[in-house]
Amino acid sequence: MDRSEIVARENPVITQRVTNLLQTNAPLLFMPIDIHEVRYGAYTLFMYGSLENGYKAEVRIENIPVFFDVQIESSNTNQLFLKSLLSAENITYERLETLTQRPVMGYREKEKEFAPYIRIFFKSLYERRKAITYLNNMGYNTAADDTTCYYRMVSRELKLPLTSWIQLQHYSYEPHGLVHRFSVTPEDLVSYQDDGPTDHSIVMAYDIETYSPVKGTVPDPNQANDVVFMICMRIFWIHSTEPLASTCITMAPCKKSSEWTTILCSSEKNLLLSFAEQFSRWAPDICTGFNDSRYDWPFIVEKSMQHGILEEIFNKMSLFWHQKLDTILKCYYVKEKRVKISAEKSIISSFLHTPGCLPIDVRNMCMQLYPKAEKTSLKAFLENCGLDSKVDLPYHLMWKYYETRDSEKMADVAYYCIIDAQRCQDLLVRHNVIPDRREVGILSYTSLYDCIYYAGGHKVCNMLIAYAIHDEYGRIACSTIARGKREHGKYPGAFVIDPVKGLEQDKPTTGLDFASLYPSLIMAYNFSPEKFVASREEANSLMAKGESLHYVSFYFNNRLVEGWFVRHNNVPDKMGLYPKVLIDLLNKRTALKQELKKLGEKKECIHESHPGFKELQFRHAMVDAKQKALKIFMNTFYGEAGNNLSPFFLLPLAGGVTSSGQYNLKLVYNFVINKGYGIKYGDTDSLYITCPDSLYTEVTDAYLNSQKTIKHYEQLCHEKVLLSMKAMSTLCAEVNEYLRQDNGTSYLRMAYEEVLFPVCFTGKKKYYGIAHVNTPNFNTKELFIRGIDIIKQGQTKLTKTIGTRIMEESMKLRRPEDHRPPLIEIVKTVLKDAVVNMKQWNFEDFIQTDAWRPDKDNKAVQIFMSRMHARREQLKKHGAAASQFAEPEPGERFSYVIVEKQVQFDIQGHRTDSSRKGDKMEYVSEAKAKNLPIDILFYINNYVLGLCARFINENEEFQPPDNVSNKDEYAQRRAKSYLQKFVQSIHPKDKSVIKQGIVHRQCYKYVHQEIKKKIGIFADLYKEFFNNTTNPIESFIQSTQFMIQYFDGEQKVNHSMKKMIEQHATASNRAGNPAGNPAGNALMRAIFTQLITEEKKIVQALYNKGDAIHDLLTYIINNINYKIATFQTKQMLTFEFSSTHVELLLKLNKTWLILAGIHVAKKHLQALLDSYNNEPPSKTFIQQAIEEECGSIKPSCYDFIS
């Protein structure tokens, strides 16, 4: 069944009416979905979408004028000059027209308001672009100069939205298979002002299943043996979740089902061709999948390339244009499209964009709607929306079913795949994605593709131009090309009143907020680029003529920026472009919100089974989409005005808005203070105010004269809240009147939303309390929280739970007569319970999430991913599955826990087990499977204590000296240190670890001192050899004999020892004074000669003992950890000897003595710890352990060591 048959079956009445209209060439309604341009030769615009009944349609718009405007000084003298300029550059144009427009930058008085422009017409976009580039380089100001997407300019000029119903008139019509082709001119297109009929565009939701013979890996399209073995597709009306048809294309036999049509293919190549064939039969307007732009489309395209069928597939799927492979890859396969998710995050998408079908990745849409979502899986988004979940089918089972070709089991796979596709449409409809984006397109004169794949800034810019160019807004000439030097710097910061930190339990606090501060400032002060006056001279001249100006000044990059804006004084004709647009948007939104309220009230009165409920629901969704679109534009308006890459950017305007915000908040602050009110906190656009004590005198006295029960106190609090609400309502009206008198307009207004009581301020933009909106409500389970980290992305349940307990406990109503525990006491009580009663916590309380961004220096995540990579490689070597350690996609969030590692110390008592977060992280599945212990103390110290410190850092003991600049940071650091010590005192395991470290350090210190003594003895012996100036050789021999007496046995001469002595003698020779015969060098040569000739017996004995020394060293090294020994040897050799000549002679002795000492400490450390109760081990005990160990090394050298 193809699209036309489905349309005829589902909409027979409308289809008959549309058929009659086509036969009589009567006007038709058309809903555009996709836009394509023919930019070579004569410009042609193609619009693809559906007719009223659902027929697929192509609208070809011809005879579209191609032009741009250039500003000139005189309409009489410059046309010829402009012609000569273009001719000199061989730029071909059709004709020139002279017109007048208002330049967008700079104020112009009434008589000079309009400037002459020449509109240059061309036959092609190529010539137009050449001319724009040339004239801009020559310094001319151009307008209507879009160089990327000309269709946006067409939409603006014709006032023809590209995402709403259009009426086709005087068209030529040609049926072409499933497609109904129309040819029109711009005059034949009329924007349909009403909401129009129900849209019957078709959405195809799909999902693919892939297979790899390498178990535990994600199938890779670049691997020849990895295949796509199933593609399931479902089609819907754009507004519905009821499927119109379903198809399963599979390479494995699948049991038949009434829910879908099954197509069995013999190969992957045939499966892909069948997918294209089915796609062409349904001719969808929108194609959607979940994460398909990151996996499904790249897999399909890559496999099609490998089979050599991409060109055939594209041309089957595209009902309109057939293309060659190189053109497909260049123009229609979007390999890397950056989609903005939030201000901080973007994601790369890849897809095949066939003309007439708009691809939409549902995952991207959901991530934009929930930019702080910790999980971005299909299952997570479905749960978040309360929709039915996807089918649970593990990949290893799916692959097993595919391998066995079990038709019944493959039916389960098909159902799994079909439901995944179904859930994509469920999410699109639930979130009203298409209607919302369409309303944005209607306002901004952009396409649906623009609304999905581009950020909000360019839409605001396009909307501004659309308003500006028409007569009712003054025919302002706007360029789309950013000009001038683009400086980077900070605009004036917000006016901030530091919070009065701590818990407020006696007086309610009320927040007064400016309603949409920046848009309101733009409307109030007429901030608009064409109202800007740059020079003081011109400003004085205008004021002398009676004009009212608003002066702005601020410092930017250490220089004063100033300017003036001509005020409108509430005269509509004097309003600038920006205020006019904002006022229009505000009025439209106000009307829509009123309508939305009425529709909502109707919905509550009608049951879902009522015949008119669905229509009412549809109307409610459409109105809501419109008001949301207006809200988006109003909120992003200032962002574009302050964007230095925007063609509308004006530095005095951007900074003037923020500095005016400062001024007005200060104005209100002083007004409120002078009225006797108190200020708890103020920032940017809001003040938190307390009423005078006198307001509560009567109710307080009534309580004091009562029995002061808890009920009486609750009544007192209740009445305080009511009094505050009434007082704030009056104050708010007075503030707004004061603002009106100051700025002369009613656009800048404040409103109060709620009364907070009790309330606690913990820092800038950080506070919580109980909010009372319309009536008093002292429910501690519904707290008003701003900026407290328990709602931070990635935060654990542990932190959220502890933070919530502290806040809820602190918000309890307590009479002044009762004990009111200070916040620090509440924090310590909650913390103690959390640390001591560990059994209350579940595994899920410790799960965290983080994002994998390879290009960012997140050390913990980088270390963790490096460890996981090493594990995967190790498992692959052994042929084991490694999917549990798979790396997430860049930008994707993953879940993990921090696990406990075994406590280890080095010989000096320093912790050697890694405390780095990245070394303790484990995937949740791995930690659960192996039952790894959670490092609770790590969570407490690194996540919980920072939050808890925020609650108590206002305490006097944590306050910094006067000379500290960042007082909040200082107090926070001191408070956290205080809580760390508190946790150490109550955490039994932490106390044990500290004691172990003390024992290690004591043991090391004693052993180190003993070894230094032994080394000192031998150092003194050999120093005597040098100090004996009368007979040094004899002194050396005696010292050597002293050493040799501790060894016995005859062995062969150790030639390596002889080499060492020879090398040392040579090195010493090089180090000596080359002039004359230095005594040191001569002495060494004499020693060497005597060793070889005169004292052969003693030397022979020394050589013989060399083997014994080497044997001893080998024994020691083989019985201890060599790496630790080597490291600690370097650490312990911190003392020096007076003569470098003895270094070699001491080297052997020092080395094996130190190694023996380390061996002692290492060997007996556990015994020391096991015997350790509450007191450190005695010196006698340690000495005894050392003597026992030294004796066990080798009996013959016991005395020598001990």
Swiss-Prot record:
Gene3D superfamilies: DNA polymerase family B, C-terminal domain, Helix hairpin bin, Palm domain of DNA polymerase, Ribonuclease H-like superfamily/Ribonuclease H
Reaction equations catalysed: DNA(n) + a 2'-deoxyribonucleoside 5'-triphosphate = DNA(n+1) + diphosphate
SMART domains, sorted: POLBc
A GO biological process held by the record: DNA replication
Annotated region (3 X 4 AA tandem repeats of A-G-[NK]-[PA]), positions in chain: 1071-1082
GO molecular function terms noted in the UniProt entry: DNA binding; DNA-directed DNA polymerase activity; nucleotide binding
Keywords for the protein's UniProt record, in alphabetical order: DNA replication, DNA-binding, DNA-directed DNA polymerase, Early protein, Nucleotidyltransferase, Repeat, Transferase, Viral DNA replication
Sequence ranges of the Sequence repeats: 1071-1074, 1075-1078, 1079-1082
InterPro entries documented for this protein: DNA-dir_DNA_pol_B, DNA-dir_DNA_pol_B_CS, DNA-dir_DNA_pol_B_exonuc, DNA-dir_DNA_pol_B_multi_dom, DNA/RNA_pol_sf, DNA_pol_B_thumb, DNA_pol_palm_dom_sf, DNA_pol_type-B
EC number, UniProt record: 2.7.7.7
Enzyme class: transferase
Note: Consistent with its intracellular location, ASFV encodes its own replicative DNA polymerase and three base excision repair enzymes: a class II AP endonuclease, the repair polymerase Pol X, and an ATP-dependent DNA ligase.
Its job: DNA-directed DNA polymerase involved in viral DNA replication.
UniProt similarity note: Belongs to the DNA polymerase type-B family.
Family annotation (PANTHER family): DNA POLYMERASE CATALYTIC SUBUNIT (PTHR10322), DNA POLYMERASE DELTA CATALYTIC SUBUNIT (PTHR10322:SF23)
Official protein name in the record: DNA polymerase beta
